[in-house]
Amino acid sequence: MDGSLYGECGNYIGPEIESDRDSDDSVEDEDLQEPGGSNGWITTINENQNIVLPEDKKYYPIAKEVYGEDVETLVMDEDEQSLEQPIIKPVRDIRFEVGVIKDQTTTYVSTLFLIGLMSNPALVRNVALVGHLQHGKTVFMDMLVEQTHRMSTFNAENDKHMRYTDTRVDEQERNISIKAVPMSLVLEDSRSKSYLCNIMDTPGNVNFSDEMTASLRLADGAVFIVDAAQGVMVNTERAIRHAIQDHLPIVVVINKVDRLITELKLPPRDAYYKLRYTIEVINNHISAASTNAADLPLIDPAAGNVCFASGTAGWSFTLQSFARMYAKLHGVAMDVDKFASRLWGDVYYHPDTRVFNTSPPVGGGERAFVQFILEPLYKIYSQVIGEHKKSVETTLAELGVTLSNSAYKLNVRPLLRLACSSVFGSASGFTDMLVKHIPSPREAAARKVDHSYTGTKDSPIYESMVECDPSGPLMVNVTKLYPKSDTSVFDVFGRVYSGRLQTGQSVRVLGEGYSPEDEEDMTIKEVTKLWIYQARYRIPVSSAPPGSWVLIEGVDASIMKTATLCNASYDEDVYIFRALKFNTLPVVKTATEPLNPSELPKMVEGLRKISKSYPLAITKVEESGEHTILGTGELYLDSIIKDLRELYSEVQVKVADPVVSFCETVVESSSMKCFAETPNKKNKLTMIAEPLDRGLAEDIENGVVSIDWNRVQLGDFFRTKYDWDLLAARSIWAFGPDKQGTNILLDDTLPTEVDRNLMMGVKDSIVQGFQWGAREGPLCDEPIRNVKFKIVDARIAPEPLHRGSGQMIPTARRVAYSAFLMATPRLMEPVYYVEIQTPIDCVTAIYTVLSRRRGYVTSDVPQPGTPAYIVKAFLPVIESFGFETDLRYHTQGQAFCLSVFDHWAIVPGDPLDKAIQLRPLEPAPIQHLAREFMVKTRRRKGMSEDVSGNKFFDEAMMVELAQQTGDLHLQMI
């Protein structure tokens, strides 16, 4: 059998055919044929048909083929960008501000005219509107905005005002102001002369008094808005003291005068008594707050520094403007000032003789203010509200006003606004008051610079600021930061004192920690944009002259609270403006953490922005790692947490229950001299502690006495006011924990026992240790307060190597702690001053609510001219959480309260008494509170429950202590 006929598997394949052989030969010939040759239907070899490996394939054209030879292309690796950063960032537009319609930005004067007024400081007035909550500051601003803009801030349909300077959505929802917002308005006086009035509308709630502090720093005067019905309330009192301390002139606007007519329904004579009483109370507070009351002008309508107004009805006047209106109405040429001076006080008009006299006419009569001002005002209100059209027409005609027939078809409130605004005209009287009693930036420069600038008076910068020199060195004081619409960065708001700030200019940004000796807190930034801030819109400008307020972009990166801007190229020493001095303290704190731990960096960044946005807010990290926020009260912290969640971090945040800050103090002198040796056993410090004199801590905090005084000044002050001996008064080394701290360190050593040169050599180290200890006390790491530390003995090594700061600082801190613990230590808690408005039948319930919370009433008096009572009380801050809700519940919502920090008080009980047993879920007795507060505070901070004596007492000190007391139980101290 022929094997070639079968395959490998035995299948028959048959013999080879001739045609198959020819086909194979032809294929071999084709493979050998040259390219371009002709061989049947195949003519060329296409390279694209060759087999190409996957890694060699070309899927897309190269960049040169697409863009050409002249275009440079850059290729970045895929891992150059973090995973958290999106390739295309979404546009962040957080709607936290109220939008503005284009028509609402149109003013009666051109923008160029407004900018031109900025260059003439004599035509500029910088003021802040301050006052109590709901006294009408924002609505009064609405009236001024309406008179300068082609718009109406009043909605006739729902009888509500726009609240133009409440730019945040939550401000509109809560019906309170949270942030201070400026506006620059061109107002005309009675002679039709235009002035640029930079006005800052500040919050009236005492929780946000830090905004008022930042505003007063930029202002040359304070305009107090006082409710005619309520009178002077707690925030007005505090604002008066604040303005006096800042050396600012004061003018008053008695607002809501129509409440005396429509709500209280007082007769005109009683309304006059009510207004006069309000002015007397203001003058009493001014006199009480001033150290030299003789230099302060009293508030007197006859002097022109009082304006009567109703923001809701859209009218305002002074006695001078009312007298001018009478002169114009009757066409009589008269001395307006003399006539105005007779419209206030016990002055009567005698119609028979046509003269004014201090005695009433025969048969009786009303005072001139009642006869010429209140009675016509009452007549307008009564007739418009009574809807007597004919009588209204007659009354308005007597005053020279005619309204159209369509006007009388309006509702009562719009008709009242129209009638009053037609009678009283524009706010020219208010402008006259500002021009006459508030100095221009040039006139106020010396007083402002002396109060806020830390440099010397013999420097060129000081002279330029006093002169408001536009060609001098640039100096800008920044006190406020406003977030942009995406809340990623801030624009800063400040006042130019000298020089001219321009866009594109490089400036040095000096922080609060800057000094010519330590330039670490300094950066150089470029000003990218400048605006005039107009609440809901901004006017771009290219430069800002001295005396102007300006909003600045591009310099916020290193600013936390306040800053000083100066020329980047200026070579002389530059000092900063002082940090803001607030009239309250942030004593309420809460801890926060993100719901998702991976979002902690976002929350930390949000907390940093919170610190920028809120002047008094303090954010810090405890030793336990928790992030805490300190604020003035519950409302303040609520606003902060809302902004943290919705604006600045956009993460879900968990918030702990609020707690309070404590202080540590002593009530007796140290029971023995306490000493501590340095680690190298070459030095030894001996110290005792004792309480400070009553009132001294407040004097230090208020700046009545300063550690920067020389020894003679300090000696005279302490010797005359606190009866210190001259040697002790001149031995003061430092205040602690800072220059305005409420603790004092004295060198009470004898020159015969201690080498003075060696003591002076280690003075700085001992002071640092003392201030470190005063900042964090031994009980629960809270600041020490009201303690005097005396160095009674010291053994200092003569070799500098053995008495270095590393040896002396911790030793000074330790001996201060031991002296403190041997002086009967106590805890101090913050206490609120509470002012409650209530009807008389709710006073008993208020006493009950306060007594349950360790509070007590100091006075309850009727509010003059009203059916309400004013209850004044003190309440520990730690007991205040939920107090307002509790109060409203027990009074059926009829009582309204405001609370503000007032003083520190000692907590009942001994915090070191280990015999006290704290039981969970049970209220502690009053005498156990100090122990409970200390233990819980230490737990929260991640510390051990008890104070360990081994940490603060040397072994030799413990032995001596045991010998004197016969007990070593003090290890628990």
From Swiss-Prot:
Subcellular location: Nucleus speckle
Record keywords: GTP-binding, mRNA processing, mRNA splicing, Nucleotide-binding, Nucleus, Spliceosome
Domain called tr-type G: residue spans: 122-408
InterPro entries, sorted: EFG_III/V (IPR035647), EFG_V-like (IPR000640), EFTu-like_2 (IPR004161), EFTUD2_N (IPR031950), P-loop_NTPase (IPR027417), Ribosomal_Su5_D2-typ_SF (IPR020568), Ribsml_uS5_D2-typ_fold_subgr (IPR014721), Small_GTP-bd (IPR005225)
Residue stretches of biased makeup (Acidic residues): 17-33
Domain of life: Eukaryota
PANTHER family attached to this UniProt entry: 116 KDA U5 SMALL NUCLEAR RIBONUCLEOPROTEIN COMPONENT, TRANSLATION ELONGATION FACTOR-RELATED
Protein name in UniProt: 109 kDa U5 small nuclear ribonucleoprotein component GFL
Native source species: Arabidopsis thaliana (Mouse-ear cress)
